[in-house]
């Protein structure tokens, strides 16, 4: 089983979710126009659709594996979009989350 395909989908889903949530953040916390919500809601719908594209027997397992990728992508957003360099604790926590996601994705399953 190759992990490249689900990881790629999870990365795209994370970007879509973070962008969608940031649209709400921009509106409610940064005073941006409510028009930010239109692309934000589209982005959140794309996020939800992308998670259904992962080859997983159970939604909960797909979401759990996605969580590790989401945390790491959020730290990337923090750095690249918001200009805040992650701390060593952010990086350590993100790495642990990715490790957990890999265990969930690659772990053996009963037939």
Swiss-Prot record:
Q: Which intervals of the chain form a coiled coil?
A: none
Matching entries from PANTHER family are given as: UPF0060 MEMBRANE PROTEIN YNFA (PTHR36116:SF1)
HAMAP family tied to this protein:
UPF0060 (MF_00010)
Its family remark reads: Belongs to the UPF0060 family.
What keywords are assigned to this protein?
Answer: Cell inner membrane, Cell membrane, Membrane, Transmembrane, Transmembrane helix
Q: What is its main location?
A: membrane
State what protein this is by name.
UPF0060 membrane protein Pden_1837
Q: Name one GO cellular component term.
A: plasma membrane
| Record-annotated membrane-spanning stretches | 7-27, 30-50, 62-82, 91-111
